[in-house]
Amino acid sequence: MARITVDDCIDNIPNRFELTLAVTYRARQLAQGSQPMVESKDKPIVTALREIAAGKVGREILNRGRA
């Protein structure tokens, strides 16, 4: 598989700090058993980056669970 970088994801979430939060939040979900939205046999953090780069996950993940 091709290597995934932060630069591949920055188009979908332009703020690097929000991108970091979104990746860690999604990686935690994947590690706890959530189904991946892209086909990947990588670690949860890489899968989360791939999902964001593909546009399957975006900034909206940061707003989940807030009242």
UniProtKB/Swiss-Prot annotation:
InterPro entries: DNA-dir_RNA_pol_omega, Pol_omega/Rpo6/RPB6, RPB6/omega-like_sf. One of its GO terms (molecular function) is DNA binding. One of its GO terms (cellular component) is DNA-directed RNA polymerase complex. It catalyses: RNA(n) + a ribonucleoside 5'-triphosphate = RNA(n+1) + diphosphate. Transmembrane segments: none annotated. It is an enzyme of class 2 (transferase). It comes from the Bacteria. Its EC number is 2.7.7.6. Keywords: DNA-directed RNA polymerase, Nucleotidyltransferase, Transcription, Transferase. One of its GO terms (biological process) is DNA-templated transcription. Promotes RNA polymerase assembly. Latches the N- and C-terminal regions of the beta' subunit thereby facilitating its interaction with the beta and alpha subunits. Belongs to the RNA polymerase subunit omega family. The RNAP catalytic core consists of 2 alpha, 1 beta, 1 beta' and 1 omega subunit. When a sigma factor is associated with the core the holoenzyme is formed, which can initiate transcription. NCBIfam families: rpoZ. This is DNA-directed RNA polymerase subunit omega. It comes from Thiobacillus denitrificans (strain ATCC 25259 / T1).
